[in-house]
Every structure is written in structure tokens, then in C-alpha cells.
Amino acid sequence: MDTKIIVNHALRALLYEVTVNPKPGLVDPLSAGPHPDMNAFMFIDSALSLAPYFNACAAAGVAYTAVDLTGLFKQIRGIGVQAEQTMFAATKGVNTHKGAVFSLGVLVTAAAYQLQHPDVDLATIVRTMLAGLTANDFNDLNTKDPTTLTAGERQYLTYGIKGIRGEAEAGYPTVMQVALPALRRSRGTINQRLLDTLMAIVQATVDTNLVKRAHDPHVIDWVHDQAHRYFDLGGSRSEAGMAFLRELNQIFVDHNYSLGGSADLLILTIFIGLQTDILA
């Protein structure tokens, strides 16, 4: 494997995620969900605009020789800010992949670094790269102007939810311990397998995008129950399970709910699945 393959897998992960359908509360080819300003074509444009960014991440990872891997993260974080602007230019200001710019950029960098250090597992590389991330990012939030806080910062202050920063700093345990095993167990078409993997993620995670939309952390208990029901109905390989997803999407549209955090974790899962031939 080389960096070109890693970048290819990153782009495929973004494109696979938007193609999977029907996804409740998310954009797919059949529905924009609660995102009237988005469509699948916009996600394709957004994904392809990020190719130079992933190439830069991979190049940084494979060339990095210093012992302190937090320096590698600092390198790509600056590149990521530029990539966000490229994405916004491609989508005319719509936030399609900002979460993936961070999370998938980290994984692409770690996977490229691993090419030179095959004895170190991916999660360990990520944890070492991101050591101290939440402490650094959330330090002194109480002294900041509340109007300048991001949604993630507000949720941390209000509910103590660390969100994607906490997930990333821990080496993406939801991906490694929940989503990838679910993908390995899954059967059927790629679409069926990825739907079941998505709902396994939904069942296990605190989706900060959903909390943001609902303005209530208790919505997480509700969505976990919905994911349980989906699997009780037979999941993606049953007519009842698929009908339930379509009904659930309408509920999400009616309440303006989104599962953007879960979608980002699915992207990471697809990427690793392609890297490891779980998705052939």
C-alpha cells in the first residue's frame, strides 16, 4: 500500500457515505433529510475538493520522523483550516464535510505514518498524535465570549460532552470497538452492510449534532431506542427495517434532527474497512 491508495480510500469513504440510503436525518440520493440546503451532488463536489488536502495529510504522515507525534497533528491542523475554506468554496458556503476534514484527515495522516511504522496500530498512533487535545481546546472556555463558542464548546460547558474531540483523542473507540466489528458481522449488499453499521454507531454514540439540533441531551436515549427497534425489526435485510428507516427519516425532518456525528464516524469506519479489506 502507498499514500495514493490511502487517499483513494478516503475519497471513497466520503462518497460511499453519501450514497448509502435511506439514512435518517442525513443527506442521501433519495432525500436531503433535514438539510434543505444540501443534496448528494453537493457532497460529491465537496468530497472531491478535499483530494489535495488528503494528499497533503498523507505526505505529512509518511515523511514525519520526529518522536513527538503531537507535532504531526499541529502540522495537519493548519492544513485542515485551509481545506475547510476549499470545501466552502465548492459548496458555496454550506458545511458538508467540516467534521470529516478533522477526523478523516487525522486517520489519513495516521495511516500514512503507519506505512513507516507497521508495528504500531492505528488507534495508538491517533491517540499519540492527539494527546492533550481536549484539555488544550477546552482550556479557559469559561473566560471566552459566549457568542464566539462553537457548538462543541457550548456542549462541553453545558453537558460535559467531549464530542468528536474526545472520541478522536481516545483513538476512535466507537469506530474500533463498535462500528468495525458491526461491519465485519454485516451481510448483504454494500448498502445494506453500511446501513446496519450506521445504526450500530447510532445505537452506541452520543451524537453531538443531534444534541445541538434538539437542544436536549435526553434525545440520545430516544435515538438509541430507535436504533434498537431497527435491529429488532431485522435491520437492512428486512422490509420492516427499511420501512422503519424511512419513517424515522420523516420524524427527523419534522423535528429538524440530524445524525451528522454518526455520519462522520461511518466515514471513518468505511475508510478503515477499505484499508483492511473488510470492505472489498
Curated annotation (Swiss-Prot):
Reactions this protein catalyses: 3'-dephospho-CoA + ATP = 2'-(5''-triphospho-alpha-D-ribosyl)-3'-dephospho-CoA + adenine
Keywords: ATP-binding, Nucleotide-binding, Transferase
GO MF annotation, one: triphosphoribosyl-dephospho-CoA synthase activity
One Pfam family matching this protein: CitG
The keyword Nucleotide-binding belongs to this UniProt entry's keyword annotation: yes
Enzyme Commission numbers on file: 2.4.2.52
Family matches, as InterPro entries: CitG, TriPribosyl-deP-CoA_syn_CitG
UniProt GO BP: prosthetic group biosynthetic process
Family: Belongs to the CitG/MdcB family.
This protein's name: Probable 2-(5''-triphosphoribosyl)-3'-dephosphocoenzyme-A synthase
Source organism (scientific name): Lactiplantibacillus plantarum (strain ATCC BAA-793 / NCIMB 8826 / WCFS1) (Lactobacillus plantarum)
